Regions:
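Conserved, structured core segments of small domains
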Residues: 1-125
Length: 125
């Protein structure tokens, strides 16, 4: 089984408070369906992109911390799922349901690297 990121995109000026009760129930129902199928590993909603902080290493080795997202675009990731699926087609089937429930575009990407279960963060054992 492979794991996939399903990223939900929102406009730069998206206000999470406008989400309707019906939309939230559809998202909760989809999450329950994903859990029952053993597909959902993690689900998260993110604060608006304007709340982000970005860090960039400078030529002198110091880190520059700036307000706002790393890239300046009209859409940003507003939330995501980490799913386990047999293949890309299965991940896309879940992503279709996510796009409908969230009423937003989604992007699907396979996760290429996962630490081994015994591996500590940072790569040491």
């Amino acid at each position: 089984m492979s794991q996939y990121l399903v990223a939900i995109y929102r406009s730069d000026d998206y206000d999470p408070s406008v989400e309707t009760e019906a939309m939230m129930e559809e998202i909760h129902a989809l999450n329950r369906e994903m859990i029952a199928a053993g597909a959902r590993k993690l689900a998260c909603g993110l604060s608006p992109a304007g709340n982000a902080k970005s860090l960039r290493k400078q030529p002198d080795g110091k880190l520059l911390v700036t307000d706002g997202p790393y890239t300046e675009t009209k859409e940003h990731i507003g939330g995501f799922w980490i799913l386990e699926a047999a293949d890309l087609d299965e991940a896309l089937a879940w992503a279709r349901k996510g796009a409908i429930a969230c009423r937003a575009p989604v992007e699907v990407r396979e996760i290429l690297f996962r630490p081994a279960p015994t591996q500590e963060p940072g790569g040491s054992k």
